[in-house]
């Protein structure tokens, strides 16, 4: 990692370049997380979405035909199924996906601090945080839902709290602390943060557009949907790397947290692909 990563906030180009480098350098352990955590989630989501679509189709057909005493029970049953499976999708996003996100983020931190990349340790620590993920996830979900009803506060907080999962996984925050910690890192930099998140989202959407071709290889819609969901998580893993790097950079610059490794432990190659030990511009000027 370039020395100034821990002392200066990087710009978008530096962050994005580092994100591609870290993602490529750790593709094997990231794929392991995808296979162990996100592949089962993809299959689960495919089942949930399939059932929700069926229920919604019935709901729509009855609504268009007109609700009467003869179909009233079916109408409310279909409505219940739509709401139930929508709730399941929300729970998966709040409680299961963060486990994989934290595992990848921990490997990013291991990489930038020049520690040995341990997939097993990262995944084990992520699973051990499940109680905190659930508790903080409930608080986050309820508050985001309530503020989203007013739209503008919901948009503001969704960006201000973007680091709440990383605060749980990388900084050991609990309860409301992850949201406060994230907001402190975004304070005064909301638009800059929003812009970078938008850039990551655009890259992920471009990848996902290419991944839509996977549907043509599977005649079974449910299997095709599961494969597509999994490939979308590949894009999401890149976004996670980008967000984790931004979090670590902001945290080190804001709080002076000793994220940087000892000089004797640092290998020659940096995160951005430069070689450590070469004279810096300031050192060359001194000479």
Language-model regions: role of each:
Residues 34-53, 84-101, 133-158, 194-240:
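Hydrophobic alpha-helical transmembrane segments in multi-pass membrane proteins
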Residues 56-81, 118-138, 210:
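Long, highly hydrophobic alpha-helical transmembrane signal-anchor segments
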Residues 1-7, 14, 18, 55-70, ...:
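Juxtamembrane transition segments at transmembrane-helix termini in multipass membrane proteins
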